[in-house]
Regions:
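Ubiquitin-like/PB1-type beta-grasp interaction modules and other compact soluble beta-rich domains
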Residues: 1-79
């Protein structure tokens, strides 16, 4: 099974929420790993991430990753 390299970038708000997680992570995972599985592998609770961005696309947490890429993770926005 082939492996892919994924770079995760946390936005400042998410970085503040997840202080124990570095703001940039490089992970090597099997091709076909879902976004949700990647987050769990990185120690990031999937519910803490509202949006996952790849380039100009928004990914669903059930989307499978097949190529080396960089993902930006956004936290939920609080407000009233």
């Amino acid at each position: 099974m082939s492996r892919i390299r994924i770079r995760l970038r946390l936005t400042p708000h998410l970085e503040e929420m997840l202080r124990e997680v570095p703001h940039r992570l490089d992970l090597v995972v099997p091709a076909g790993t879902t976004v949700r599985g990647l987050l769990q592998e990185a120690g990031i609770p999937p519910l803490a991430v509202y949006t996952v961005i790849q380039g100009r696309s928004v990914l669903d947490k059930d989307d499978a990753l097949s190529n080396d890429t960089e993902l930006t993770l956004l936290a939920p926005v609080a407000g009233g």
